[in-house]
Regions:
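Acidic beta-strand-to-loop metal/phosphate-binding motif
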Residues: 50-58, 101
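Low-complexity, acidic/Ser/Thr- and charged residue-rich accessory regions of DNA metabolism proteins
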Residues: 263-264, 299-344
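Phosphate-backbone recognition surface of nucleic-acid-processing proteins
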Residues: 217-220, 226, 230-309, 344
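Short glycine-rich, Thr/Ser-proximal phosphate-binding strand/loop in the N-terminal lobe
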Residues: 15-38
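Glycine-rich, often acidic, oxyanion-interacting loops/wings at catalytic, nucleic-acid
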Residues: 127-217, 277, 293
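Gly/Thr-rich phosphate-binding beta-strand-loop-beta motif of the actin/hexokinase/Hsp70
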Residues: 2-22, 101
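Short alpha-helix plus adjacent loop in nuclease-associated cores
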Residues: 76-125, 166-170, 262-277
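Short, basic/hydrophobic alpha-helical segments
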Residues: 37-52
């Protein structure tokens, strides 16, 4: 039986530090290579066989993972925060980091994190780019208001971004000079252009063969629209990786961390260790969901009487996560259980 060789990779923008050890911890090779596909191909030809590798999750890990995956017996990605706690040291450099990652992999002590498939990651990149466009549209709309206010121009803020009102405002308001009018037109054209691109991206994702059926099932849940459904499908990936709804709620950042010692139990505010894209989308969806679901409206009212509106919104968001997990696991359209109907 061939012995396995273990490789730790410390990945950076331009360089990758590596460390190769056998099962007994004997060092076979270490060094540094350029972070390019060609250099990785040359490097892999020098490796002893068979080999498995591990790297820390960074913004550069995706393409390296995809390039090495076909050649490795096993390839893992480590959770950065957990790995930092395990491999804490006074002395730290790229060579030592690669060696520690290699030892964690060799001893089966690597805090592995989930790596979505290439297809999901490519589509997720598109969705996150769409979120960037939305933020830029909001910035342009705020800039339009700021330009008008700093020039002392009166306007109707509820109608400002309506096409007809905006055109009429530019044409008839005497307080808008030619220089300001040009800037306002450019801002408006930017908003329109970004809106068209954003709409086209959402249409392409909704009609994507990999997502169509899944998104349609998720949208059967009251209060879940195309953006929430797409965000869930692409940020979660494989829903089976969550063994319980509580773990899914934690991943979405809808609960606080616990700090307990002795008889003292302390719950912190919402944890920063979460998927921020899912957290934002689910909280926004939870604000609208009670309008479409009597059971969610009842839950919101009950929680609001106990505390404040934010806690009620979080309770609805957690219930939405439970619905999303159930529909995604069962691969069926949403339906309310009989006991929930009776409770409502």
């Amino acid at each position: 039986m061939e012995s396995m060789y273990y490789i730790g990779l410390d990945v950076h923008k331009r360089k990758i530090s590596y460390c190769v050890k056998d099962g007994g911890g004997k060092l076979h090779a270490e060094g540094m290579i350029s972070a390019t596909r060609l250099d990785l191909d040359h490097w892999m030809k020098t490796l002893p066989q068979p080999w498995s590798a591990a790297m820390e999750a960074t913004m550069f890990s995706g393409w390296i993972y995809d390039h090495l995956k076909p050649h490795a017996t096993a390839l893992k990605v480590a959770h950065p925060l957990m790995l930092r706690a395990i491999a804490a040291s006074k002395r730290k450099n790229d060579r030592i980091d690669a060696s520690k990652i290699c030892d964690c992999l060799r001893c089966d002590f690597l805090p592995e994190c989930y790596m979505a498939s290439t297809a999901i990651r490519e589509r997720r990149r598109t969705l996150r780019y769409r979120n960037l466009l939305v933020r830029q549209m909001v910035q342009m709309k705020i800039k339009i208001s700021a330009l008008l206010m700093e020039s002392g121009v009166s306007y109707n803020k509820e109608r400002l971004h309506k096409v007809g009102y905006f055109r009429e405002l530019l044409a008839t308001n005497p307080d808008i000079d030619e220089g300001l009018r040009s800037l306002l037109r450019q801002c408006r054209e930017t908003v329109v252009r970004l809106s068209k691109i954003e709409s086209a991206m959402i249409r392409s994702l909704r009609h994507d063969w990999l997502l169509t059926e899944r998104v349609e099932r998720l949208m059967s849940i009251p209060g879940v629209g195309p953006i929430t459904a797409l965000t869930w499908a692409l940020e979660i990936g494989d829903v089976q990786r969550f063994s319980s709804i509580k773990k899914a709620v934690s991943y979405c950042g809808l609960c606080g961390a616990e700090k307990s010692s002795g008889n003292m139990v302390q719950r912190t505010p919402l944890s920063k260790q979460r998927n921020k894209h899912l957290q934002t989308t689910l909280i926004e969806a939870a604000k609208m969901a009670p309008r479409y679901s009597p059971s969610l409206a009842l839950l919101h009212d009950r929680e609001r009487q106990r505390g404040n509106a934010n806690r009620a919104t979080l309770a609805v968001a957690r219930k939405l996560v439970a619905y999303l997990v159930a529909v995604d696991r069962g691969k069926t359209h949403f339906r309310i259980a009989d006991r929930e109907v009776c409770a409502a």
